Amino acid sequence: MNWICLLIFAFFSIAAVVKDIRELMIPDWTIIAGSAALLAYQALFARGLIVQGLLGAALSPLLFYAVRRITNFGMGLGDVKYSILCGLCAGANLAFLSYAAASLICALYFASKYLLDKKTGKKNGRKAKIPFAPFMAAGIIAVCAIDRASSFV
């Protein structure tokens, strides 16, 4: 992973994240165009990243599909597909650490939201829909940025 890959990922993730927050849907074009842009960049300028990227893109949806099945389709198919773009950006070596970070960020956000709602008397059911793409994007960007920054030290 390098900074250019991270910028390409962030560019295409903005639309995915905004749409997921607003409508709980991730547009396929963001995944297809983002993946094509990342693959083109890696093939032309960063050949050393392509194997890890393809491995991450192949393994990530398997993990998210398993989560989708285990949770009785609680996770949307858009998140499963979006994991392809995430895996392609981070590579297999960083993708799963990024997903752990995404889950932690999500848990902290919703725990604080729950406590705030409890304090204000607002009621939200346990079945509330969660847009997970923002947390996936945050996890990928955080872990990849830390990885790149640590290479300068």
Where do the PLM segments sit?
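A membrane-topology feature that recognizes alpha-helical transmembrane segments
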Residues: 1-153
